[in-house]
Amino acid sequence: MGKEKANVKGCRFRVSLALPVGAVVNCADNTGAKNLYIISVKGYHGRLNRLPAAALGDIVMASVKKGKPELRRKVLNAVIIRQRKSWRRKDGTVIYFEDNAGVIVNSQGRDGRVSGIAGPVAKEAGRPSGPKISSHAPAIV
């Protein structure tokens, strides 16, 4: 009597976890933040004593380490849009980026507080976080 997960709707293909709590990622939007320090990962349920880690498309709680003074020392929501750790898509392609990056989003974690994103965005990151991130991206990979 094993647990069967056939025909489960709404589950996404698993992306390799790449960014543990304490990681510093680039901020790829034009809000004025330069670096984001990951404090926690929303919706993470893991093993005892294991550091929570984020992957593409995950919503994280982050603070701004470098950037405009009005953004610093505040806890903000962000979505991871690029990661250096490679992951495999269902079609067999293996993809990775040359940096780790995220964008600041609103308190619900849906739409970004941005009007521009620098660099490409993975298509896995655009789906869960709403249409705004995908529409402001110069390239979707």
Curated annotation (Swiss-Prot):
CC terms in the record's Gene Ontology section: cytosolic large ribosomal subunit
HAMAP family per the UniProt record, alphabetical: Ribosomal_uL14
Superkingdom of the source species: Eukaryota
Location of region: Disordered:
118-141
Q: Name one Pfam family in it.
A: Ribosomal_L14
Question: Which GO terms are recorded in the biological process aspect for this UniProt protein?
Answer: translation
GO MF annotations, alphabetized: large ribosomal subunit rRNA binding; structural constituent of ribosome
Q: Which UniProt keywords apply?
A: Ribonucleoprotein, Ribosomal protein
What is the protein name given in its UniProt record? Answer: Large ribosomal subunit protein uL14
Q: What family does this belong to? A: Belongs to the universal ribosomal protein uL14 family.
Question: From which organism does this entry originate?
Answer: Trypanosoma cruzi
